[in-house]
């Protein structure tokens, strides 16, 4: 990260270990106003932090297109994830990821709220068109290759929805309580995300609206810290759904 030809403090810190104590020193330099702006006013973007030289980054929705209701610029509309999965062609998924990533970059975006890799648990799920399959391995492979392709184009992807957003219908997605055994959770629903982190180097995820048991997925320490970071070694960012 540069400013007027000089590397900023953030620029020097990039590439350091996730647990490097210098990150704490860097964060201590943020002003109250900057932290407020970062957390409260970051709709489809990550705001600038002038004190440490962090620029604004812009994101856009759309698993099948770089563009959505929240942006005026649109890229090409691609076949949905289910159609892609039916090809069983991981190489094609990588090409798709690179293509949509290049379009996002051309339109001035830095990241995408995509792809989505929840399960086709029921034909009545209102978001099935965004998801690949009822098969965890196929979903994780196709999604992982898509993320790899976008990364080659310089675009990061917030893969969604972590986790179990498999029963959304109408406007009640924030009131869905999901119950299952831990074995089912790990072997079916978490598996694609585990592959993304451990095998494909995913750096960003989007949490889901629903609850796992009685705990909101976006506020679950068991999911977001114990499993995602402590077990899988995820060092990236998690954004809540909106």
List PLM regions with ranges:
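Glycoside hydrolase catalytic-domain context in secreted enzymes
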Residues: 1-242
């Amino acid at each position: 990260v540069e400013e007027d030809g000089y590397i900023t403090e953030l620029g020097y810190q990039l590439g350091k270990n996730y647990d490097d104590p210098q990150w704490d020193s860097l964060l201590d330099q943020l002003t109250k106003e900057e932290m407020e702006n970062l957390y409260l006013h970051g709709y489809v973007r990550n705001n600038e932090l002038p004190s440490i030289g962090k620029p604004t980054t812009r994101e856009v929705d759309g698993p099948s297109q770089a563009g959505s209701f929240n942006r005026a610029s649109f890229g090409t509309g691609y076949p949905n994830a289910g159609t892609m999965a039916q090809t069983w062609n991981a190489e094609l998924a990588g090409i798709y990821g690179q293509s949509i990533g290049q379009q996002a970059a051309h339109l001035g975006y830095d990241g995408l709220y995509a792809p989505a890799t929840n399960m086709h648990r029921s034909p009545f799920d209102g978001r099935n068109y965004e998801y690949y399959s009822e098969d965890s391995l196929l979903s994780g492979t196709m999604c992982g290759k898509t993320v790899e392709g976008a990364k080659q184009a310089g675009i990061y992807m917030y893969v969604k929805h972590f986790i179990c957003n498999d029963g959304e219908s109408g406007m009640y997605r924030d009131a869905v309580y999901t119950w299952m055994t831990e074995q089912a959770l790990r072997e079916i629903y978490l598996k694609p995300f585990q592959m993304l982190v451990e095998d494909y180097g995913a750096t960003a995820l989007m949490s889901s609206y629903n609850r796992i048991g009685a705990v909101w997925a976006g506020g679950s320490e068991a999911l977001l810290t114990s499993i995602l970071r402590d077990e899988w070694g995820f060092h990236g960012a998690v954004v809540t759904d909106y």
